[in-house]
Every structure is written in structure tokens, then in C-alpha cells.
Amino acid sequence: MKKTLLGSLILLAFAGNVQADINTETSGKVTFFGKVVENTCKVKTEHKNLSVVLNDVGKNSLSTKVNTAMPTPFTITLQNCDPTTANGTANKANKVGLYFYSWKNVDKENNFTLKNEQTTADYATNVNIQLMESNGTKAISVVGKETEDFMHTNNNGVALNQTHPNNTHISGSTQLTTGTNELPLHFIAQYYATNKATAGKVQSSVDFQIAYE
């Protein structure tokens, strides 16, 4: 019994020493921050799964990289956004928008536009879909698996915290006002040339979630 106990104590001591000897040059730490708010907006039922059809366009309109064509408006409507229905004030958001993301077809090399998902023999090449804010001038960078601006390096060992919110990817951000039941959020979709386009079909898709500020 004494030998067994002694062996266990030696083993524990050894394990403790191993744990204490982790090389700081080959290890690190990632800290995650977030916040849950009281707001209760919902996506209007008929807007949860939308189809947006862009008019046909001639390939000469997309003959050069970054050419765009056929800006097409679409709207996603939220409901139950009256801020007075949210409890308290400390954890209540003032603005709401949408967070667009896709883990499979975001094209980092072409301004985070959406790749053409068509795989039929007659699909267009060098053509993506770009999302824009409703003003038609600000591009939306769809979040993908290679998006990096959520990460922040800790400066001099001081961790960033929730006083550094990341709202870079909230699109259509709109002020919440009392009495708001339905809240339409407006956006634009357009063709985007990644090089000289060829004729054919174009299809892409993006996921979204409600996001608050």
C-alpha cells in the first residue's frame, strides 16, 4: 500500500513538472468575447428563403476584372423589432442589421464576392455575385472561412475585451425605434467579373443571420 501511494505521488509530481514546462514559444491562448442582447427581432417568414433573379447581361459588360453589371435590389424584412419589448437597458441593442456569410463559396481573392455555384456544362466563367449596401456604393464583404478581421492581436499582453466590438460585417445597419414592428432592410446584388467573362448560367447563394449593435 505504501509503495503504491509513493508511486502515485511521484507520478503526480512528475505530471505537474511536465505541465509547468510548456514552452511559451510554441504555445498560446485564444480568448473569445461576445454578448447576448435582449432584443427579439425575427426574420419575416416569407423572407427566410428568397430567390433574386438578375436580368440577363451581355458578356461584353463583364469583359474586364472588377466590372459590375445589372444592380438588382432585394429586401429582407424583420419583425418584432420594437425596442420597448426588450427587457432592461444594459443589454439592449440600438441598431440591427444582417450578417451575411458562406463557408463554401466566398471568394477572398475577389473582394469577398460569391462564387458561381453552377456546375452544368453551360455555366459562365469568371463571374461572381457581389452584394452591396442599399446606397449602391458600399460593397458588402461576405464573411467566409478566410475572413480575418475578427481577430485582434493582444498588445503587450493586454487582452482586448468587449469594449472593442466587431461590427464590421453588419450590413444594412438600421436604428431601432419605438413602435417598429416590421423593418425592411434593403440590399443590392450584381454581377462581378473576376476576369473576362464567358457566356453561361450564374447561380450563387449566401446565408444570413440577424446581428445587433
Swiss-Prot record:
Q: Which domain of life is it from?
A: Bacteria
Q: What keywords is this UniProt entry annotated with?
A: Disulfide bond, Fimbrium, Signal
Secretion signal: which residues? 1-20
A GO BP term, please?
cell adhesion involved in single-species biofilm formation
Annotated InterPro entries: Adhesion_dom_fimbrial, Adhesion_dom_fimbrial_sf, Adhesion_dom_sf, Bact_Fimbrial_Adh_Pro
This protein's GO cellular component annotations are:
pilus
From the record, give the cysteines joined by S-S bonds: 41-81
For the keyword Signal, the answer is: yes
Briefly, what is this protein's role?
A: Mediates adherence to oropharyngeal epithelial cells. Helps the airway colonization process.
Family label = Belongs to the fimbrial protein family.
Query: What's the protein here called?
Result: Major fimbrial subunit
